Amino acid sequence: MGAITLDGKATRDEIFVDLKQRVAALTAAGRTPGLGTILVGDDPGSQAYVRGKHADCAKVGITSIRRDLPADISTAALNDTIDELNANPECTGYIVQLPLPKQLDENAALERVDPDKDADGLHPTNLGRLVLNNPAPLPCTPRGIVHLLRRYDVEIAGAHVVVIGRGVTVGRPLGLLLTRRSENATVTLCHTGTRDLPALTRQADIVVAAVGVPHLLTADMVRPGAAVLDVGVSRVDGKLAGDVHPDVWEVAGHVSPNPGGVGPLTRAFLLTNVVELAERE
């Protein structure tokens, strides 16, 4: 008997139905939300990702605001674009698409974004608000993970969650989300310096793999019946591969596919952050 699929696409569609109604109410009140993107250069992956975000906007009625800039843009010109979106009343929230070309300082660009227009929830101010449990846009991927677990009635309160990966977009903020009183999980954050990773993952009720190492998590590392979320993305022989080996499906109780699991919810909660920012205005 295989694991239950944590279906991110179906869950995203449910979220979009809700967002469409909320956007319609905001529009009727004269406050249509707008999502902005700043894309520098012509990286195919980044272009596809931005196109997907704006296609999502069209589905729920959010206004799209695109700023596509040349790869050789100066820091001053990028700053001008960020400042313009900070001041643009039609732009409720926006993102600076990463990676940026090498001549640009990514951290400086992200810090220049108005924290109250931070659609990704990754501005240093908003990460600080998360630590303090103050209202702020939440990081999209961690929020999607928590939502997906709840959608499929995976018990979070009291659960031991092992997160593999300490990146700023997933691992670190996910630990903060899961240890809030509203979630009440116990979190072990693992990384390249962790000793005996399999011993830790075998104790876990929930494992989140977010490192970008193909098929890192194998069946012998998973406790029977555990929930496993596959977040990392890499390429093997030109094809997308996740961090979770296919044999895990025969042992785990729940597994998120990759693609089609957490990824769709990352995009859904980007839009959710924008709608919530509009509702606060």
Swiss-Prot record:
Q: Which PANTHER family match?
A: C-1-TETRAHYDROFOLATE SYNTHASE, CYTOPLASMIC (PTHR48099:SF5), C-1-TETRAHYDROFOLATE SYNTHASE, CYTOPLASMIC-RELATED (PTHR48099)
- UniProt similarity note: Belongs to the tetrahydrofolate dehydrogenase/cyclohydrolase family.
Q: Enumerate the Gene3D superfamilies for this protein.
A: Leucine Dehydrogenase, chain A, domain 1, NAD(P)-binding Rossmann-like Domain
The UniProt entry's GO biological process terms, in alphabetical order, are:
L-histidine biosynthetic process; methionine biosynthetic process; purine nucleotide biosynthetic process; tetrahydrofolate interconversion
Q: Which residues hold NADP(+)? A: G165, R166, G167, T192, V233
Q: What does this protein do?
A: Catalyzes the oxidation of 5,10-methylenetetrahydrofolate to 5,10-methenyltetrahydrofolate and then the hydrolysis of 5,10-methenyltetrahydrofolate to 10-formyltetrahydrofolate.
For this entry, the protein name equals Bifunctional protein FolD
Listed GO MF terms:
methenyltetrahydrofolate cyclohydrolase activity; methylenetetrahydrofolate dehydrogenase (NADP+) activity
Superkingdom assignment: Bacteria
Q: Subunit structure, briefly?
A: Homodimer.
What sections of the protein cross the membrane? none
Q: Which UniProt keywords apply?
A: Amino-acid biosynthesis, Histidine biosynthesis, Hydrolase, Methionine biosynthesis, Multifunctional enzyme, NADP, One-carbon metabolism, Oxidoreductase, Purine biosynthesis
Which GO cellular component terms, listed alphabetically, does the Swiss-Prot or TrEMBL entry include? cytosol
E.C. no: 1.5.1.5, 3.5.4.9
| Pathway note | One-carbon metabolism; tetrahydrofolate interconversion
List the catalytic activities from the record. (6R)-5,10-methylene-5,6,7,8-tetrahydrofolate + NADP(+) = (6R)-5,10-methenyltetrahydrofolate + NADPH; (6R)-5,10-methenyltetrahydrofolate + H2O = (6R)-10-formyltetrahydrofolate + H(+)
